[in-house]
Amino acid sequence: MSAITRQDEDLLLALYVQPKASRDELVGLHGEELKLAITAPPVDGKANAHICKLLAKAFKVPKGKVSIERGELGRHKLVRIQAPEIIPDDFAQFL
């Protein structure tokens, strides 16, 4: 599986998450996954909520259309974005 996969109108993102980073950014590839650095700590679901909010803003969809399919308790996550309005350039290069 590649880092970003199309499934009908949805996108599946394979992410490796680095919490408590100095800023939110897409770092690049980490093996077969996209490395996403986020400022939120991995406590009480704050990192997961931050990922959903960050990706919803980037892909211009409501937060409810971003869901973590796999990996809620770990750094390796599979995130579904339902019918994204746009695909940001920094993500599009990995399609």
Swiss-Prot record:
Gene3D superfamilies, per database record: YggU-like (3.30.1200.10)
Source organism superkingdom: Bacteria
InterPro entries noted in UniProt: DUF167, YggU-like_sf
Family stated for the protein in its record: Belongs to the UPF0235 family.
HAMAP family: UPF0235 (MF_00634)
Pfam families, per database record: DUF167
NCBIfam families reported in the protein's UniProt record: DUF167 family protein, PRK05090.1
PANTHER family (UniProt xref): UPF0235 PROTEIN C15ORF40
GO cellular component: cytoplasm
The protein's name in its UniProt record: UPF0235 protein Sama_2480
